[in-house]
């Protein structure tokens, strides 16, 4: 892992400490914008407080960012724990990071994804499926059909591992011999490794479920698919509605 990858992890991962005040997506976006134009040699060394001040940050913010970057022992310990649980980081500057996320989400792409499973699946063409947890019978059949058809056409299925539409489509795809990328909103480390299934989570591998994590991962589900199928959604509220409306607003991928 090179210095830039370590830097992304130190700035964006809680490293097992829920009280660690990491950079938000907006703060990471601002830092990336301010870092543009810096020489490669500057990007490969550890940032100092003066570097952050020269980028336009006040002294308090510069001290906070430097404190995050100094947690190297905690990072090494966290990486070691992750390896034992078969969880590995893919930062926005890593070779394995999906280019389609950089292309579609640009500065809003996650600083780090944690992965469990076959990373080569990340480079395969995919479609996505989202939908409600409580499904009507006809919509459950639709979700299963999307999963089956993805496998039949050699496309990876991207979904969110929630009960209902997500798992229905995922299981149909796997049963048909297809590949699945499942972006979870709970503890990645507790997911059982399965053939043709790659689990991903944002920021860390041991974070508990939260509504914020569930909503945040929706942009990745929508952006990874060349098309997104919506099995069912409540009108005006809920995660499926929120993610789909944002996709339509920002044009990450076509919605069907």
Model-identified regions with their sequence ranges:
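Short, small/acidic-rich helices and loops at N termini and domain boundaries
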Residues: 1-94
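Glycine-biased, small-residue-rich flexible motifs in mid-sequence functional cores and linkers
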Residues: 1-22, 44, 85, 92-256
